[in-house]
Amino acid sequence: MEEDFSSQMKKMALAMGTSLSDKDIELLPTDMRHHGSFNYLKFFKHIRKLHASGQLDDAIHTAFQSLDKDKSGFIEWNEIKYILSIIPSSGPTTPLTDEEAEAMIQAADTHGDGRINYEEFSELIKKEKIPKKK
């Protein structure tokens, strides 16, 4: 059975280390969906809006810890792949492709070591360097 939009948005938020209530889901802009697929860039922007500036650093820290599955202090390709594996490929959301995930790592990886540390991750979120979905 396919999950509804609300369930998938809650999973996405959990994967990012935060959560969305049913009320938050209702407040999501309708333009976040385009031709039945999900607009990740608008989702990330909206999540940042849900957290007041005083809460943004905490939200980023929580999201980083959630994504850093092995607690190495880095988000690595295998951890990105894990997140991709828990996002359903059908329904109102479209998971990132391998190429889009690689583009995200490259956008954030300012040190060029193929992985994302906390500072790079924080900068990615704060500076909106998330690559656009094709």
From Swiss-Prot:
Q: Which residues bind Ca(2+) 1?
A: D68, D70, S72, F74, E76, E79
Indicate whether Membrane appears among the record's keywords. no
Protein known as: Parvalbumin-like EF-hand-containing protein
Keywords of the record, alphabetical order, are: Calcium, Metal-binding, Repeat
Stretches that traverse the bilayer: none
* Biological process (GO), any one: skeletal muscle contraction
The record's family statement is: Belongs to the parvalbumin family.
Q: Name one GO cellular component term.
A: troponin complex
Mention one GO molecular function: calcium ion binding
PANTHER family attached here?
A: PARVALBUMIN ALPHA
One Pfam entry for this protein is EF-hand_7
- Annotated positions binding Ca(2+) 2: D109, D113, E120
Report the residue ranges that make up the EF-hand domain in this protein: 55-90, 96-131
